[in-house]
Amino acid sequence: MTKPQGIAVLGATGSVGCNTLDVVARHPERYRVVALTAHRQLDKLFEQARRFCPDYLVVADADAAARLRARLAEAGLRSEVLHGADALVQVAALPEVDAVMASIVGAAGLPSALAAARAGKRILLANKESLVVAGRLFMDAVRASGSALLPVDSEHSAIFQSLPADYAGNPDGAGVRKIILTASGGPFRNRPAADLAHVTPDEACRHPNWSMGRKISVDSATLMNKGLEVIEARWLFNVPPSRIEVAVHPQSVIHSMVQYRDGSVMAQLGSPDMRTPIACALAWPERIDAGVEPMDFFSLSDLTFEKPDLERFPCLQLAFDALEMGGDAPAVLNAANEVAVAAFLAGRLRFVDIPRVVAASLSGVSCAASDSLEGLLARDEEARRFAEGGVAAC
């Protein structure tokens, strides 16, 4: 019998992490959970530990680790508890780990994802910031180690499935004309521009189609999420920005498309359920049950497409601008956006000021290219400080 794959789920208590464990639980003969990590949600992590009995658990700090150890001991569970950023890097590169679900939100997920790449792991990439912040560095590590990189974002999974199996980062050789990323348009697609100044965090977090965490829900509402996905697609598929297009598709049935030179368009369709791309990445090239109901085509409404409104939602254009600027501009964009979104969720910044803080940061922070992880993290910190000043000035 084939030995089960060892899985580390980084960001286990978030939306993607929970969905990953839902899929894994359906296939105990295929997967063994080696490590689970969480930032704040200790209760949820404890329940996951009871169910999956991982070898390692990682939490943010020593206090959280001590509290978790006490609960595990009381329950008779033997998972080893580690803490801190170095522990995330450690479990991502463990010899007994075959695949790493990289689903920590934001730039905080970069060091552990990069460690998995350097260790030659099969990387299930949900942390798009790894490529936004460190695209060249990350892809160089993947190539050097022979790591397998499989996208988990529904759009990039759709592109991956719509490209030839031997694509190998060669769009011209594969006859690719362009990549078309679809976007739902978010909860404010039809909201008058004048009303956007009064948007509340709770409104921004109510996505019309997908169930997601609060940060990514706000990014979806501003279209920054789609902008980050454009940058991610550039690195994943080695396609220049001029050959990446965004189409607003409110029904979220077509998850993305590839247009070929001969006029053909290949698309991947499915219900808006993250378990589908997660299962695809976990088992590729095989297909496994994800617990997702089959799509009923006869119950679908019309499938419609619109151009994105870049005046009302300038974050998407800012992402294209950062790609064109090159260097560390995408890292600056991401850092400033994380600061601005956190301020918005905390009630310190208006929704319409998020792109203003990001634009000011792109203009005010040096975007000269860094050639190391340490340099990129220093640029990230510089951009965060600048953006905090921008938030205070709004």
Curated annotation (Swiss-Prot):
Q: What does this protein do?
A: Catalyzes the NADPH-dependent rearrangement and reduction of 1-deoxy-D-xylulose-5-phosphate (DXP) to 2-C-methyl-D-erythritol 4-phosphate (MEP).
Positions of NADPH binding: T13, G14, S15, V16, R40, Q41, N127, E129, G213
Residue positions annotated to bind 1-deoxy-D-xylulose 5-phosphate are K128, S154, E155, S184, H207, S220, N225, K226, E229
What GO molecular function annotations does the UniProt record carry, in alphabetical order? Answer: 1-deoxy-D-xylulose-5-phosphate reductoisomerase activity; manganese ion binding; NADPH binding
What pathway does the UniProt record associate with this protein? Isoprenoid biosynthesis; isopentenyl diphosphate biosynthesis via DXP pathway; isopentenyl diphosphate from 1-deoxy-D-xylulose 5-phosphate: step 1/6
Q: Which gene encodes it?
A: dxr
NCBIfam families per UniProt: Dxr (TIGR00243), PRK05447.1-1 (NF003938), PRK12464.1 (NF009114)
Stated name of the protein: 1-deoxy-D-xylulose 5-phosphate reductoisomerase
What's its top-level EC category? Answer: oxidoreductase
Q: Which UniProt keywords apply?
A: Isoprene biosynthesis, Manganese, Metal-binding, NADP, Oxidoreductase
From its record, what is one biological process in GO terms?
A: isopentenyl diphosphate biosynthetic process, methylerythritol 4-phosphate pathway involved in terpenoid biosynthetic process
Q: Write down the required cofactor(s).
A: Mg(2+); Mn(2+)
